[in-house]
Amino acid sequence: MPDDAGCFPLPVLREGAALRGVLSVEPALPKVLEALGGVRRVLPDGVVIYTGADTNTGRWNEARWRARWGAIAPPALADMLGNADQPVTVLRHRIPMILARTASRIAARVPQPAGIRSDTGHESVELVSETISHRGFFQTRTYRLRHPRFDGSMSAEVEREVFVASDAAIVLPYDPQRDRVLLIEQFRLGPFGRGDARPWMLEPVAGRIDAGESAEDAARRECEEEAGLTLESLEFVTSYYCSPGCLTEYHYCYLGLAQLPEVNQGHAGLSTEHEDIRTHVLPFDKAMEIVATGEADNAPLILMLFWLQANRARLRRTA
């Protein structure tokens, strides 16, 4: 099992090798292991194991694995086992999102400043029950809970639902020498589900932060995948909950400095993810014009264009 074997490394059969561990009797585990790429093997003593491909990349380093994956693996496995009623192909498709939303939950443990707002913590909420009311690529959880009120009392027991997603990296590519930005356009299900007359959106580059990946690395990867663009550097803009009343998704926003192409339009996206993306390279003034007209009508794009407006002179001066 090599060091880069991922969150759930599988053993490789080697002559004379030994593996210490606990044999699981969890009935759903074989399907999860198969979805993770495991091959079922029956050993001479009748023990069934699932093995991975022999990539000849060396021995597995437990300490390195624990540092990167130790906190993610147990809750992610529990989530996978909860999805084991699905066909293997469906479960395999869901695994990256399961890992990503587990990683986002762990990232949320790092507290943000509380200079004005209350510093009352997560542990002060009295959780009565938590159920998963929908399991799909995304997840919906239903909570029954009581929380502290500002007068010092506890609230009545309330039932609330939350849509559980992963964290995301958002990037606005900007060429300070040409004073141009790159936007992407694609069909979006949120506007379609709302009944929007035009469910194609102009947006910054954006995408899921995979488990074990930094927000910065995700930002660079998404620019390559969605726009065919290699960034020169990143400037952190801000981070925030995009809709804290009902959604767990958390955004990490960056300005990506790059040399943008001369062509105004292009086509990009990963065919494996059924992406159909058109890119637009716009002068900064034109980008601000579509904010004024309302054609730019999603929060990340508007927020980041206003940030660029405030920082544009500095960026152009140092380009």
Where do the protein language model's features map onto the residues?
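Glycine-aromatic micro-motifs
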Residues: P2-V125
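Active-site-adjacent beta-strand/loop module that shapes the phosphate/pyrophosphate-binding cleft
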Residues: Y50, R146-R149, S243-Q265
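Short amphipathic beta-strand and strand-loop transition segments with alternating hydrophobic
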Residues: E123-H134
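Acidic, metal-coordinating catalytic segment for phosphate/diphosphate chemistry
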Residues: S133-R178
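Conserved hydrophobic/aromatic beta-strand scaffold that supports enzyme active sites
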Residues: T140-T142, L183, C253-L255, T279-V281
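Conserved Nudix-box catalytic region and its N-terminal flanking loop in Nudix hydrolases
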Residues: R160-A165, L172, Q177-R221, S271-E273
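A contiguous pocket-lining binding segment that forms or flanks enzyme active sites
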Residues: G212-L257
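NUDIX/MutT-family hydrolases
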Residues: A268-E295
